[in-house]
Curated annotation (Swiss-Prot):
One GO cellular component term noted in the UniProt record for this chain: Golgi membrane
Record: glycosylation sites: 71
Principal location class: Golgi
Gene encoding the protein: SPEC3
Protein name (Swiss-Prot/TrEMBL): Protein SPEC3
Key word Protein biosynthesis present: no
UniProt keywords, alphabetically: Cell projection, Cilium, Glycoprotein, Golgi apparatus, Membrane, Transmembrane, Transmembrane helix
Annotated region (Disordered), positions in chain: 1-63
Transmembrane segments: 107-127, 163-183
Assigned protein family: Belongs to the SPEC3 family.
Length: 208
């Protein structure tokens, strides 16, 4: 039978199982100052005395931001053409009551009719009435010229018939000849000018 050691007796016997031998770290490779991970060394933490890792040493490059490149695209368009301005000039003559009775002749014809009325009362008035068809009242229609001729023909006859009555016809014919010279300004004038300007801002009408 095996003997049982008494309680409290010192046990100086070696342990039944020896401890496992510890493995030594592998030797460091040249060019790497830090030991490799996975051999009993904790991984280094950034921000605690360790420099940040450099690009190109086992770290992928950062992704490029394609949205920034798309947002920087500049589109240049041609400016819209300015609206064209159109200017229309209209010259027209407006009839008046004096023009219907007193024809508008050239200044030379008006002076000639005045001379006839001075020396031959009423004759210059009749000549001015018939001359309206060839060289008087520019721009007037045919009916207006016929009316002017009839008025001056009958006025010329009245001037001839009243010249013996206190020289009334003679004075009347001189005043009528002076009116021929006054109406000659209407013959030389271009009439009323109307300027119509159209553009992007609307239509502008100017009457001169």
């Amino acid at each position: 039978m095996a003997q049982v050691a008494p309680t409290g007796a010192p046990t100086d016997a070696p342990p039944a199982y020896p401890p496992p031998p510890q493995q030594a770290p592998p030797p460091q490779q040249p060019g790497y100052g830090q030991p490799q991970l996975g051999y009993g060394q904790p991984p280094p933490q950034l921000g605690y005395g360790q420099p940040p890792p450099q690009l190109g040493y086992g770290y992928p490059p950062p992704p490029q931001n394609n949205n920034m490149m798309m947002n920087n695209t500049v589109v240049v368009t041609a400016p819209a053409p300015a609206p064209a301005n159109n200017v229309v000039i209209i010259n027209q003559k407006k009839d008046n009551c004096c023009r219907q009775a007193i024809p508008a002749h050239h200044i030379a014809a008006a002076i000639l009719c005045l001379i006839f009325n001075i020396f031959f009362p009423g004759i210059g008035t009749i000549i001015a009435g018939f001359a309206v068809f060839c060289c008087g009242n520019p721009g007037a229609d045919g009916g207006s010229k016929v009316g002017t001729m009839c008025i001056n023909f009958w006025i010329g006859l009245l001037q001839i018939g009243t010249v013996w009555f206190f020289f009334l016809g003679w004075i009347w014919s001189i005043m009528w000849g002076a009116a021929f010279i006054g109406m000659s300004a209407d013959y030389h004038s271009g009439g009323d000018t109307t300027i119509v300007a159209t553009g992007g801002g609307g239509t502008t009408v100017i009457n001169n």
